[in-house]
UniProtKB/Swiss-Prot annotation:
Protein name: Protein transport protein SEC31 homolog B
Biased composition (Acidic residues): 549-560
Top-rank taxon, per record: Eukaryota
Record-level GO cellular component terms: cytosol; endoplasmic reticulum; Golgi apparatus; plasmodesma
Entries under InterPro entries matching the protein: Sec16_Sec23-bd, SEC31-like, WD40/YVTN_repeat-like_dom_sf, WD40_repeat_CS, WD40_repeat_dom_sf, WD40_rpt
Keywords: Endoplasmic reticulum, ER-Golgi transport, Golgi apparatus, Phosphoprotein, Protein transport, Repeat, Transport, WD repeat
Keyword presence, Protein transport: yes
GO biological process: endoplasmic reticulum to Golgi vesicle-mediated transport; protein transport
Low complexity composition-biased segments: 959-977
Pfam families: TPR_Sec16, WD40
Location of region: Disordered: 527-562, 782-811, 851-874, 892-931, 952-994
Assigned protein family: Belongs to the WD repeat SEC31 family.
Organism: Arabidopsis thaliana (Mouse-ear cress)
Length: 1104
């Protein structure tokens, strides 16, 4: 229903300007339901939250007379005593009473509410209004024609301005209404029942304008336009001509507009303070109408009652709420929105002007945008002399996680150059800043991964609590027991490997290597040879043969077990080494068994060694057994998880190559099963297992809060993850880790760090991105501000002057390269070979790639060079070559190379073209086009790299073509042939395009022709011609790829679907497929895809 509140009173109404209250004074000449003749001033509270439809009475005071007019003004005195302002009542006896509404609704006695009594007028006061600008000014007008201005700065002592000149004259007539100008505080308007309207200037103390219509109709009410200073609306209560006329003081010869709709005289009127296009009127025809002052049409009408309304007002605090007092003895509070259906004929309902009020327009507005943006708008004050209100829009960068932004900037700066020194410094700083022991351990280990070559193994072992000797002699294993060092076994069997003579002599001092049994002592009853040369070697230091023989005889005589000795000797005499070994093992003489087995050959030595190792109970012998049998995995499963540091140190010392990664993974899995999470994480780090490591770290996001926000925890996690990824060179991540990158990129984007967010997303392999991640990547890419192109357009490449006829040597710098750098493709290449000078590619610093000094280019002259581009290798945290056991080949044959991994590879990274430039001629990284191959680069041999966690791929220089050497013969001095122009739509060879792709060529050719014609064709200006030529070159490069079959099946299929959509003029689908190509096949299609989109947009515009 339209009426939302009400009260049963026949009263004039005044609404509080700044509080939810309504004053009601008993109306003169009206009879309420009680037929009472008393007069009262009452205060009602406008409580719209209450379900009660009746307004609650909060204050009441009797009045000496009834009211003709009631006004409520703001506090003009500035005193807290009058915080709710003043209520002025124009009485029928010509007096004006002033009340303090705060006293009426407060705890003070109501008798104190009457604060002033103004007695000047000699007739009923029908004109009464407070100045909207200077609220201490009150204007009053009565039937005597006088207009009085009161200063109520002190309400208890009001002052009266001198009477206005001309006021009270016979021509003025009975004042029916007065109104202050809403913009100019000294301008006052009055109207009278004789049809005259007068405009007064208080500064001049006289009227400045007066006017009337041609028939001088009675004027009952007038209102100033709230927005237009010079416009005033005057209404007539003449039943024969109940019109409303809008006058402009700049031309009073005739009204600006006339409003017709009432059938009888207009009694009351008020202009909407919230929307100057709405005017509310009530008349004696029992209609209350809301007008559109711009069109003079009816917008809404209140429901009709049993009797007409005589007083209407807009509620200033809530737009669209109005009050209406009727002769039915009711005061109703209405919502103008609920009144829209009234007063419009049913058959004309659809033609009624439906216009949203201005209060529906938000004075201010704000909306969050992608990329940490906040857009806001607010109304701007209209220019002087105009009524139109303009809006201003502001774009703000909103940062809610300031600590995250600062930490991200610091972290990005630390890893921007990518050199190991800065990364080590970063890890050391993080280790010092954290208070968690686990974090200190983690960052300490990450720091070791960036140590210099040859020192990382030592650093890791030291980090685990072990100390290596200063000098490692012959790479022997230190730290093991002295028993292991005492085992010096040499193989002298005929089928054994050749060893140094010094080792042979060290093992058997009496053995000259010719005949073992010549030196074997004879039995007591056997004659002893007297030949010295047959008994001992020439370098033996014994003085006489007799002394030696005597000693040996004495030793044999002192034997405690002659039976055992005889059995051993018999076996040795006949060469039955196995029997001799078995006898020794039975007698628990393992040392003797090992010595004899070593002479008996490799098979006997290995079996005897295994028996010895199995029977030995010493803990360190388990380590020896694992090393001898190359079974380091057994150490992982047999040693207690409590000694994980010792186990990891053993793996670091002896594991080789990929074995290190596998064994560290196994040890980490065992530690995780045992509940030692920190140790497991450290082992996973050593193994280079990024996914498993980050999976464990990610649990802190849900488990660890400690008053820290999710963004801070995620920042900690991503810093460790990125450092670990940089160390391992890993770019293949699991779906859960990709989701983590997505969450982090979203947070960065929400803080306005779009460029940084894109860098993190580029870490991920674009081939396996989820649809959500692809959308986020595309959204960030489109939202980021484009880079400013500061270079001149054109296919240019900086060159340096080089001497001629140099040897084609290649220096391969051993520097850290960016494992995540995007590989940009070259669109085409020259089709002939000339002597080439190799130049390094221009490098663009990124957060994962250091800015490296350019090595000096070297000329190389090759008629048909071959490519040496290699894909990036994933490297793990591999220790350097373990120290080999002395004479290790006697234990086992080596199964792996002595180097843990290879040295720098010679990867060739072409230079990405700058914005607005065409890619220069050069080889393609992924081979999209048949290009001349790069010359073979030979890098110097690299030594053992050590416990190095990162790959160090070199950057192969790219070749450019120098001028011909001046020393060549005359034929060679001729100008070189011009470069082959790039293929275009017209010149590209499409003879070998498969049949199912022929429609693609036809569709794209048609699209190019239509777009060229739209751009002006041959008549196009220079700018448009450049665009046409660019379109032709880009499509020509695509045609070359289709012709050579050098395009992936996925990209070709999507391209075919796109062309089918173009043939059907379905540009929306075509553009959607273009977005899919952008997100999934960008590396392959980036050269021509943007051009294709531009042409499709142009074609769609032409269709429209």
């Amino acid at each position: 229903m339209a009426c939302i509140k009400g009260v049963g009173r026949s009263a004039s109404v005044a609404l509080a300007p700044d509080a939810p209250y309504m004053a009601a004074g008993t109306m003169a000449g009206a009879v309420d339901l009680s037929f009472s003749s008393s007069a009262n001033l009452e205060i009602f509270k406008l409580d719209f939250q209450s379900d009660d439809r009746d307004l609650p009475l909060v204050g009441e005071i009797p009045s000496s007379e009834r009211f003709n007019r009631l006004a409520w003004g703001r506090n003009g005195s500035g005193s807290e005593e009058f915080a709710l302002g003043l209520i002025a009542g124009g009485l029928v006896d010509g007096n004006i009473d002033l009340w303090n509404p705060l006293s009426l609704i407060g705890s003070q006695p109501s008798e104190n509410a009457l604060v002033g009594h103004l007695s000047v007028h000699k007739g009923p006061v029908r004109g009464l209004e407070f100045n909207a600008i200077s609220s201490n000014l009150l204007a009053s007008g009565a039937d005597d024609g006088e207009i009085c201005i009161w200063d109520l700065l002190k309400p208890s002592e009001p002052s009266h301005f001198p009477l206005l000149k001309g006021s009270g004259s016979a021509t003025q007539g009975e004042i029916s209404f007065i109104s202050w100008n809403r913009k100019v505080q000294q301008i006052l308007a009055s109207t009278s029942y004789n049809g005259t309207t007068v405009i007064w200037d208080l500064r001049k103390q006289k009227p400045i304008i007066n006017f009337a219509d041609s028939v001088r109709r009675r004027c009952s009410v007038l209102q100033w336009n709230p927005n237009v200073t010079t416009q005033i609306m005057v209404a007539s209560d003449d039943d024969s001509s109940p019109t409303l006329k809008l006058w402009d003081m700049r031309n009073i010869m005739s009204p600006v507009r006339e409003f017709t709709g009432h059938q009888r005289g207009v009694i009351a009127m008020e202009w909407c303070p919230s929307d100057s296009s709405y005017l509310l009127t009530c008349a004696k025809d029992n209609r209350t109408i809301c007008w559109d002052t711009n069109t003079a049409e009816i917008v809404a009408e209140l429901p009709a009652g049993n009797n007409w309304n005589f007083d209407v007002h807009w509620y200033p605090k809530i737009p669209g709420v109005i009050s209406a007092s009727s002769f039915d003895g009711k005061i109703g509070i209405y919502n103008i929105e609920g009144c829209s259906r009234y007063g419009v004929e049913e058959n004309n309902f659809g033609t009624a002007p439906l216009k949203a009020p201005k209060w529906y327009k938000r004075p201010v507005g704000a909306s969050f945008g992608f990329g940490g943006k906040l857009v806001s708008c607010h109304a701007r004050a209209p220019a002087k002399g105009t009524s139109s209100i303009l809006s201003e829009v502001f774009l703000h960068s909103l940062v809610t996680e300031q600590s995250l932004v600062s930490r991200t900037s610091e972290f990005e700066a630390a890893i921007e150059n990518g050199d190991m020194t800065s990364l080590r410094g970063l890890c050391e700083k993080k280790s010092e800043e954290t208070e968690s022991e686990e974090e200190k351990e983690t960052w300490g280990l990450l720091k070791i991964m960036f140590e210099e070559e040859g020192t990382s193994r030592t650093k890791l072992i030291s980090h685990l609590g072990f100390t290596l000797p200063v000098a490692e002699k012959d790479q022997a294993v230190d730290g093991l027991s002295s028993d292991l060092n005492g085992i010096r076994l040499e193989d002298t069997a005929a089928d054994a490997l050749d060893l140094d003579d010094s080792n042979e002599a060290a093992a058997f001092a009496m053995d000259n290597g010719e005949d073992f049994f010549n030196n074997f002592p004879a039995k007591p009853d056997t004659p002893v040879s007297t030949s010295a040369k047959d008994f001992m070697p020439s370098d033996t230091d014994f003085s006489t043969k007799g002394e030696e023989t005597q000693e040996m005889q004495e030793e044999e005589e002192e034997s405690s077990d002659p039976v055992f000795d005889n059995a051993i000797q018999r076996a040795l005499i006949v060469g039955d080494y196995k029997e001799a070994v078995d006898q020794c093992i039975t007698a628990n003489k393992m040392a003797d068994a090992l010595v004899i087995a070593h002479v008996g050959g490799t098979a006997l030595w290995e079996s005897t060694r295994e028996k010895y190792l199995k029977t030995s109970s010493a803990p360190y012998m388990k380590v020896v057994s694992a090393m001898v049998n190359n079974d380091l995995r057994s150490l992982i499963y047999t040693r207690s998880h409590k000694f994980w540091k010792e186990t990891l140190a053993l793996l670091c010392t002896f594991a080789q190559g990929e074995q290190w990664t596998t064994l560290c993974d196994a040890l980490a899995s065992k530690l995780m099963a045992a509940g030692n999470t920190l140790a497991a994480v450290l082992c996973y780090i050593c193994a280079g297992n990024v996914d498993r490591t980050v999976e464990i770290w990610s649990r802190s996001l849900a488990n660890e809060r400690d008053g820290r926000s999710y963004a801070e925890l995620l920042q900690d996690l991503m810093e460790k993850t990125l450092v670990l990824a940089l160390a391992t060179g890993n770019k293949k991540f699991s779906a859960s880790l990709c989701k983590l990158f997505e969450s982090y990129a979203e947070i960065l984007a929400s803080q306005g760090l779009l460029t940084t967010a894109m860098k993190y997303l580029k870490v991920l392999d674009s081939g396996g991105l989820s649809p959500e991640l692809s959308i986020l990547r595309d959204r960030i890419s489109l939202s980021a501000e484009p880079e400013t192109n500061t270079t001149a357009s054109g296919n240019t490449q900086p060159q340096s002057t080089m001497p001629y006829n140099q040897e084609p040597t290649q220096a391969q710098p051993n520097v850290l390269a960016n494992p995540y750098d995007n590989q940009y493709q070259q669109p085409y290449t020259d089709s002939y070979y000339v002597p080439q000078v190799s130049h390094p590619p221009m490098q663009q610093p990124t957060m994962f790639m250091p800015h490296q000094a350019q090595p000096a280019p070297q000329p190389s002259f090759t008629p048909a060079p071959t490519s040496n581009a290699q894909p990036s290798m994933r490297t793990t945290f591999v220790p350097s070559t373990p120290p080999a056991l002395k004479n290790a080949d006697q234990y086992q044959q080596p199964t792996m190379s002595s180097h843990s991994f290879t040295g720098p590879s010679n990867n060739a990274y072409p230079v990405p073209p700058g914005p607005g430039q065409y890619a220069p001629s050069g080889p393609s990284q992924l081979g999209q086009y048949p290009n001349p191959k790069m010359p073979q680069v030979v890098a110097p041999a690299a030594g053992p790299i050590g416990f190095t966690p990162m790959a160090t791929p070199g950057v192969a220089p790219r070749s450019v073509q120098p001028a011909s050497p001046p020393t060549q013969q005359a034929a060679a001095q001729a100008a070189p042939a011009p470069a082959t122009p790039p293929p275009t739509v017209q010149t590209a060879d499409t003879s070998n395009v498969p049949a199912h792709q022929k429609p693609v060529i036809a569709t794209l050719t048609r699209l190019f022709n239509e777009t060229s014609e739209a751009l002006g064709g041959a008549r196009a200006n220079t700018t448009k011609k450049r665009e046409i030529e660019d379109n032709s070159r880009k499509l020509g490069a695509l045609f070359v790829k289709l012709n050579s079959g050098d395009i992936s099946k996925n990209a070709a299929d999507k391209l075919a679907q796109l062309c089918q959509a173009l043939d059907n003029n379905d540009f929306s689908t075509a553009l959607q497929i273009q977005v899919l190509l952008t997100t999934s096949e960008w590396d392959e299609c980036n050269f021509w895809l943007a051009t294709l989109k531009r042409m499709m947009v142009k074609a769609r515009q032409n269709v429209r």
